[in-house]
Structures are given as structure tokens and as C-alpha cells.
Amino acid sequence: MTEANRILLGVNIDHVATLRQARGTRYPDPVKAALDAEEAGADGITVHLREDRRHIQDRDVRVLADVLQTRMNFEMGVTDFMLGFAEQIRPAHVCLVPETRQELTTEGGLDVAGQEARIAAAVERLTLAGCEVSLFIDAEERQIEAAMRVGAPAIELHTGRYADAHTAEEAAQELSRIRDGVICGLNHGLIVNAGHGLHYHNAEAVAAIPGINELNIGHAIVAHALFVGFKQAVAEMKALIVAAAYRG
């Protein structure tokens, strides 16, 4: 496999913590899940420290920062607290995401175009802390161009609408939007990642898009792990997207 069609897998372990928080126990441990994921071939570990702390906790992030052998992709809202926290932890990668307390999960991309000054200031702070910053955005030209203007070196395209498509035609349309977004991002010199709602039956089509650097996948892996074990679930997803990227 050449660098041109190499693809990375970021494993999101948020929902291991969701299961733990459901009963307020100390198990299952998302840190152990992260280490198992690395052993199974994950190229990075993604965690989202939400304002309401519904799954990942501050301590999880601190421990992960010390023990990960790959790299952390730290998802966070654009708040003063989170910026300060990231400056302390200094994760390798930070992905800025939109966040509201009422949402079940992240519902859409960050509106970079509508708040360029605020996002640019956050990108600058995080970059000075040694973090590579990506912006979680919809596959829209105006948002991609805004991401470039604010100084982010990378974007993560929101694949939720593709994942939630009700018909094959709708899925094809959304996949086309993602493909166009990848091309646009690459043309603007950005690293292009993608994620949200991807699983074992829909990730291949996204992985096959030329130029995709990394897919971030979590819920599907955690769910599949209930039946096959965490390492096996990660290994299967890694093999699936690598094969798709090679064919694509």
C-alpha cells in the first residue's frame, strides 16, 4: 500500500465511558479500552470531554495523556475552560466541535464561517500549546474555506447525514458531498479526516474516497465489541477501512 491510499483509524472510546457512567461504577475502564485498541491496530484514540461530563471525565483524559502509545485526538467545545485544559494536557491533536447540552450526540458541524475570529483565536492558542488542530465541519465549501482562513491545518468532515440516510439515493448524494468536500479540502492544503455515525456497513464507501487521511469511529466499535471483544472489533474495522482505501 502506498502513502496515497493509506488510511488511519482513530478509535473513539467515549461510549465505553458511557457504559461506566450509566451505573456510576469504575468499570468498564476507557483507558484499558484505549490500550486494547492500540494493541489491535488503532492509529489514535479519540475522546470528547463534554461540558456536562456525560461520559469521558477529566481524569480519563489526564491518564490517557500519560499512557497512550499512539496519540490522543481530544475533541472539545470552544470554551475558555476547555482551551485552558487542553493547554495543560497538550494532546497531539485537538478537534474543535460544536456542543449543546441537549443533544444526544454531536448533531452537525462547527459553524466556522460564522465565527471566524473566535475560532482563529482558539486555533492560535492550541497551536502555541503544540497541538495540531482540526475542525469538525460539514462538507461545505464555505466552511472548508473558513477553516483554512482561521489557520487550522486539518478538518474532519461530518458524515452524519450520510450515515443517517434513509434511501440509497440519499446516501449516494451525501457521499458525493463528502467526496467533493475532500477534494475541496485537499485543494486548500488541508489534511482531511472524516467521521460520525460510521459503522461496519457504511464506512467502506467513505474510506475508499481518495485523499481521506483518517476515519474516527467509536459507537459501532463499542457495540460490536459486546459480541466479539474490543480488540477483535477494532481489528475488524481497521482491516475493513484499509482494504476499502486500497481498492478505492
Curated annotation (Swiss-Prot):
GO cellular component, as recorded: cytosol
Keywords tagged on the record: Cytoplasm, Pyridoxine biosynthesis, Transferase
Biological process terms in GO annotation: pyridoxine biosynthetic process
Keyword Transferase part of the UniProt annotation: yes
Disulfide bonds: none
Record-annotated site: Transition state stabilizer: E156
EC nos: 2.6.99.2
Domain of life assignment: Bacteria
List of catalytic residues: H48, E75, H196
Pfam assignment, any one: PdxJ
Catalytic reaction annotation: 3-amino-2-oxopropyl phosphate + 1-deoxy-D-xylulose 5-phosphate = pyridoxine 5'-phosphate + phosphate + 2 H2O + H(+)
Location(s) in or outside the cell: Cytoplasm
Major subcellular location class: cytoplasm
CDD domains per the UniProt record, alphabetical: PNPsynthase (cd00003)
Coiled-coil intervals, chain numbering: none
MF GO annotations: pyridoxine 5'-phosphate synthase activity
Residues at which 3-amino-2-oxopropyl phosphate binds: N12, R23, G197, G218, H219
Subunit composition and interactions: Homooctamer; tetramer of dimers.
Family per record: Belongs to the PNP synthase family.
NCBIfam families: pdxJ, PRK05265.1-1, PRK05265.1-3, PRK05265.1-5
Purpose: Catalyzes the complicated ring closure reaction between the two acyclic compounds 1-deoxy-D-xylulose-5-phosphate (DXP) and 3-amino-2-oxopropyl phosphate (1-amino-acetone-3-phosphate or AAP) to form pyridoxine 5'-phosphate (PNP) and inorganic phosphate.
Protein name, UniProt field: Pyridoxine 5'-phosphate synthase
Organism: Ectopseudomonas mendocina (strain ymp) (Pseudomonas mendocina)
